[in-house]
């Protein structure tokens, strides 16, 4: 596929998702969403993230996944020839399970690893990279891909590497990605849906939008991307029943443009290191 077709495919994806989420945010959730314009602050920056994440970061992530695959080659679990042919189907007892069972287990592993990786990015030198994602003040589906490449790369490696090294069929692993990706976009949507009795069972837009809230009581809460059980077990669950999340963004300054946001985490860590020098 040439570059023009690839760029066009991203544009088509944006139009399709934009249509879907227009219905979700503006029609189905009318009266149960935060009042904000469709063309809101930061929308151009978010569009740039969609193109760069899909066209640049995603291919680099795939390249980096050769690291765990090289471990399997060195361990003689598979060979480069088998990988080239696309005939690698995993190894060990886990790969011989029914596909549906592998998929369920992969969802659990990916979400569990993602939970702890997410917590890591809320601390120390990792936070400035994740702060880019939290900088959206008018949170909606479009802002879901406002993710610094370092954050995106580490997150994908942490989630996928254990699954590959445990022997799961990589085809099954790849098949779970579109569902997880769409759901990650959905929980950023500007809708105050909490799924009623399922609010503690599956992550919802309200659950995740509390995670993005600037209110101090919501800081460092609701890290899970799919199952709130991890937050419940580890004491980071926050879902008040008497109000909705409203105020989003971060307390520290963040450049508005794409390139400024790419550089800011490095600059922030450099500034902080200078402050702590004797």
Give names to the regions the model predicted.
Residues 19-48, 68-91:
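Membrane-helix interface linkers and caps
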């Amino acid at each position: 596929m040439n570059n023009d077709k690839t760029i066009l495919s991203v544009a088509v994806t944006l139009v399709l998702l934009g249509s879907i989420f227009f219905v979700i945010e503006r029609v189905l959730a009318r009266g149960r969403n935060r009042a904000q314009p469709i063309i809101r602050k930061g929308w151009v920056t978010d569009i740039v993230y969609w193109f760069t994440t899909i066209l640049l970061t995603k291919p680099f992530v795939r390249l980096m996944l050769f690291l765990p695959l090289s471990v399997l080659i060195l361990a003689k679990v598979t060979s480069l020839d088998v990988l080239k042919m696309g005939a690698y189907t995993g190894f060990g007892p886990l790969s011989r399970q029914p596909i549906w069972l592998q998929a369920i287990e992969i969802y659990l592993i990916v979400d569990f690893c993602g939970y702890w990786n997410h917590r890591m990015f809320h601390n120390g030198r990792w936070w400035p990279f994740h702060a880019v994602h939290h900088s959206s003040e008018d949170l909606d589906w479009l802002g879901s891909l406002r993710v610094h490449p370092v954050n995106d790369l580490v997150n994908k490696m942490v989630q996928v590497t254990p699954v590959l090294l445990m022997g799961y069929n990589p085809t099954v692993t790849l098949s779970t990605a579109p569902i997880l990706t769409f759901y990650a976009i959905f929980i950023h949507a500007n809708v105050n849906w909490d799924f009623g009795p399922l609010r503690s069972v599956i992550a919802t837009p309200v659950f995740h939008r509390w995670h993005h809230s600037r209110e101090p009581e919501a800081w460092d809460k609701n890290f899970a991307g799919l199952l709130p059980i991890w937050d419940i077990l580890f004491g980071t669950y926050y879902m008040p029943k008497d109000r909705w999340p409203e105020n989003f963004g971060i307390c520290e300054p963040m450049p508005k443009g794409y390139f400024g946001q790419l550089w800011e985490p490095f600059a922030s860590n450099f500034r902080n290191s200078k402050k702590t020098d004797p």
